[in-house]
Amino acid sequence: MASAKEDNKHQGVGIVGAGLVGCLTALAFAAKGFSVTLFELRPDPKKVTNEKNLRSINLAVSDRGIRTLKYVDSEMADRVLEHVIPMTGRMIHDLSGTKQESQAYGLFGESINSIDRSFLNDYLLDEIRHSDINVHFNHKLIRLDDLSSEEKSPKLTFLDTSESNESTMKSYEFDYVIGADGAHSQFRYQLQKSMRMNISQEYIDMQYLELSIPPNTTGDSKFHIDPNHLHIWPRHEFMLIALANEDGSFTSTFFSPWSVIESFGTSSDKFIDFFKYNFPDAFKLMGEKKLRYAFENQPRGSLMQVNAYPYHNPNGRALIIGDAAHSMVPFYGQGMNCGFEDIRVLMELIDKNNGEVSESFRQYSVLRAEDLQTISKLALDNYHEMSSKVTNVWYLFRKKIDNMLGRYGNGLFQWIPMYTMISFRGDIPYSKAIKIEKRQTKILNAIEVGTLTGFILFGAAKLAQHYHKLSNK
């Protein structure tokens, strides 16, 4: 490897990571007139012909994500939303494969929106290509220097692997630097060397395997199953989900503890038998050949949570954002929405502080911490709801009462169901939503106890009446 140091000084903002959050952060700063440079470890996707990477779990874009897209560029947001598929609720598939039950998400027909991760990332990159933002692919972050200095600008040093025959070291200086390079953030690793940062990382005992349902080529619809639902096959310990794509296919994901997938060893026959028994209708739609290929060739993905704090360095020149600061499991559909909301919150602080970025970085850490801790916990808790509770009689009863109070008692009781607050009310911070939910849960518990007591008393009265009749014979 040849090593030739090249120093390029760019006054403005340097952003590491050209994923969804990194791209939208770059567009947001550029819209405010900052000089922006974006760096990405991977090659330019336009020049890559191999298969997309492991992270193809479809995204569910909801109100928080849409608000940020519109904040950055309302016309761009409209163009993105032309490619989503609205999902008005969950469709629960039973074990027999013959019964489906729809469970609405919103009170008044609101929807979350399915969109392909790769499409959205590529679209944002295309927006960047048509802007004044500088983009450098094949840049691996090696060092982050001069963060504590008031006289010097933060310096990012990369290994540039874009040349076919050799790699070179390149350094760039900026007024401000931002890490948006995901859960395994190298930026965060370098940042914590120069400050006291609390970091927790937890792997969840859960794996995911990507599967797919092909388009329907014979019927009137290009979709085999209803595209306007998030399909769930809940089986308590494990589950299968499927979200529609524009071409008529469905991106499907099998989630299970590692012990389940590892129990099959290398035997695709065991996996096929397992799948055929637990998801019979999905098995017919996917086909044995594709399932066998997926088991034998698709990598298993790990799920982990990362939480760091504070998100900024002491002098307010560096910040981590998105998964680099708060990676979460995907079970509430809020990972990208939360990351996008990070951007809007930061931009609004910059507006409030008249363009003072350092002060905005400092305020961001304080303002955002409780919300991010809240949604990380909610995301993990929601796995139990998706895999088990959605078929529980008492859960469904509580859900009906919750929705009824939300629909008819919002004015009188200020009642808003939890899912509505998280997915459809981006004006309510996550931390405020959980406080409202705690109050409402106490009321629901009282209603549940009262109902159960009523059933018991009614049953006891009927039994006593029956006994009285028998004794009088």
UniProtKB/Swiss-Prot annotation:
Functionally, this protein is described as follows: Catalyzes the hydroxylation of L-kynurenine (L-Kyn) to form 3-hydroxy-L-kynurenine (L-3OHKyn). Required for synthesis of quinolinic acid.
The yes or no answer to whether the keyword Flavoprotein is present is yes
User: Which EC number(s) does the record attach to this protein?
Assistant: 1.14.13.9
Family per similarity comment: Belongs to the aromatic-ring hydroxylase family. KMO subfamily.
Record PANTHER family: KYNURENINE 3-MONOOXYGENASE (PTHR46028:SF2)
Which cofactors does it use? Answer: FAD
What cellular-component terms does GO give this entry? mitochondrial outer membrane; peroxisome
Q: Name one GO biological process term.
A: quinolinate biosynthetic process
Record field: transmembrane = none
Specify whether DNA-binding is a keyword of the entry. Answer: no
Source organism superkingdom? Eukaryota
Which source organism? Debaryomyces hansenii (strain ATCC 36239 / CBS 767 / BCRC 21394 / JCM 1990 / NBRC 0083 / IGC 2968)
GO molecular function annotation: FAD binding; kynurenine 3-monooxygenase activity; NAD(P)H oxidase H2O2-forming activity
- Pathway(s) of this molecule: Cofactor biosynthesis; NAD(+) biosynthesis; quinolinate from L-kynurenine: step 1/3
Describe the reaction catalysed, as an equation.
L-kynurenine + NADPH + O2 + H(+) = 3-hydroxy-L-kynurenine + NADP(+) + H2O
Compartment(s): Mitochondrion outer membrane
Matching InterPro entries: FAD-bd, FAD/NAD-bd_sf, Kynurenine_monooxygenase
Top EC category: oxidoreductase
What protein name applies here?
A: Kynurenine 3-monooxygenase
Keywords of this entry: FAD, Flavoprotein, Membrane, Mitochondrion, Mitochondrion outer membrane, Monooxygenase, NADP, Oxidoreductase, Pyridine nucleotide biosynthesis
